């Protein structure tokens, strides 16, 4: 940029040099022509002698002017050559500066493109970062929901397990096999006792009949037996015997019915116990499978957000299920 005024000055100097030279030559030739015309005029007039001294002075002046013009012309040529050299050097400097400017402009363009690429990359990374933050927030909320759901499932499972364990405990306490076996043995012994009493009553009845037969004889057996059977004592004995027999039959039937009910109840309790055990095993397996699957899902989701708290929650979730 600093070379431009110099180049303009050099061009101006180059233009001024030839102009001064032409001007000096024109002046000297003009003076010579003036002198020649003056000489011709004097020759015509005939008064040349008085003007010789004037002519000599004028010639001297012309020579001095010519010499001065020649010197000025030499100086102008020297200046012109110097300015021409300076102009050439400034032209080369101008070309070099143009090349440097072109390179700088190309570098600036590349840097601008690079800066634009960096800005686009930064914008893209900022967008990706924002998306990752939103995704992490969504995953954290989803993990929290899964934790709450898992906690609720665990609480429900614990309540169901406690309820089933309470029912199983009540059934086990009130209907133990030892207790049922004891009741069955008690009923069996009562049944045997009733059978013994029935046999004893039958033996007593046979004994009474035998005594009656021995007292009244074989002949009047039917008459005496009929009279005896019609008597109030016989009716009372028969009524008593029938009452005892009926009671014994009722007790025997009640004992048999009770034994059958106890056996059926024992079978039902065993079936119910087996069913409760199967339900407990099935429910435990299902809950464990659900807990394991939920924990695996939480572990998979927590790898992107916060795996360590997720692992701690999984250990907390596994503790009640193992208990």
UniProtKB/Swiss-Prot annotation:
GO terms for biological process: cell division; synaptonemal complex assembly. Residues 1-10 have a biased composition (Polar residues). Its main location: nucleus. Residues 20-31, 313-323 have a biased composition (Basic and acidic residues). Signal peptide: none annotated. Keywords: Cell cycle, Cell division, Chromosome, Coiled coil, Meiosis, Nucleus. It is found in: Nucleus; Chromosome. GO terms for cellular component: chromosome; synaptonemal complex. It comes from the Eukaryota. Pfam families: SYCE1. Residues 25-290 form a coiled coil. Residues 1-31, 294-323 are annotated as: Disordered. PANTHER family: SYNAPTONEMAL COMPLEX CENTRAL ELEMENT PROTEIN 1, SYNAPTONEMAL COMPLEX CENTRAL ELEMENT PROTEIN 1-LIKE. Homodimer. Found in a complex with SYCP1 and SYCE2. Interacts with SYCP1, SYCE2 and SYCE3. Interacts with SIX6OS1. Belongs to the SYCE family. Major component of the transverse central element of synaptonemal complexes (SCS), formed between homologous chromosomes during meiotic prophase. Requires SYCP1 in order to be incorporated into the central element. May have a role in the synaptonemal complex assembly, stabilization and recombination. This is Synaptonemal complex central element protein 1. It comes from Bos taurus.
């Amino acid at each position: 940029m600093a070379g431009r005024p110099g180049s303009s000055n050099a061009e101006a100097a180059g233009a001024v040099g030839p102009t001064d030279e032409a001007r000096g030559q024109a002046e000297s030739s003009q003076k010579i022509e003036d002198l020649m015309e003056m000489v011709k005029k004097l020759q015509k007039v005939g008064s040349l002698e008085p003007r010789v001294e004037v002519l000599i002075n004028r010639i001297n002046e012309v020579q001095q002017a010519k010499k001065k013009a020649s010197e000025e012309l030499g100086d102008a040529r020297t200046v012109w050559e110097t300015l021409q050299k300076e102009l050439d050097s400034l032209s080369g400097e101008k070309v070099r500066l143009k090349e440097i400017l072109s390179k700088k402009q190309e570098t600036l363009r590349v840097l601008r493109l690079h800066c634009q690429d960096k800005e686009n990359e930064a914008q893209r990374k900022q967008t990706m970062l924002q998306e990752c933050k939103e995704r992490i927030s969504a995953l954290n909320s989803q993990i929290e929901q899964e934790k709450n759901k898992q906690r609720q499932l665990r609480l429900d499972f614990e309540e169901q397990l406690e309820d089933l364990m309470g029912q199983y405990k009540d059934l086990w306490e009130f209907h133990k096999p030892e207790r049922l076996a004891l009741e069955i043995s008690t009923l069996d012994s009562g049944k045997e006792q009733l059978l013994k009493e029935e046999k004893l009553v039958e033996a007593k009845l046979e004994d009474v009949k035998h005594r009656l037969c021995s007292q009244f004889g074989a002949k009047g057996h039917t008459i005496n037996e009929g009279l005896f059977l019609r008597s109030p004592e016989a009716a009372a004995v028969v009524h008593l015997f029938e009452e005892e027999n009926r009671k014994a039959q009722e007790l025997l039937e009640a004992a048999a019915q009770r034994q059958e009910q106890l056996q059926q109840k024992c079978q039902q309790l065993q079936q119910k116990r087996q069913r409760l055990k199967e339900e407990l095993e099935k429910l435990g397996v299902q809950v464990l499978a659900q807990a394991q699957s939920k924990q695996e899902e939480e572990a998979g989701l927590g790898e992107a957000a916060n795996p360590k708290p997720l692992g701690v929650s999984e250990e907390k979730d596994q503790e009640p299920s193992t208990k």
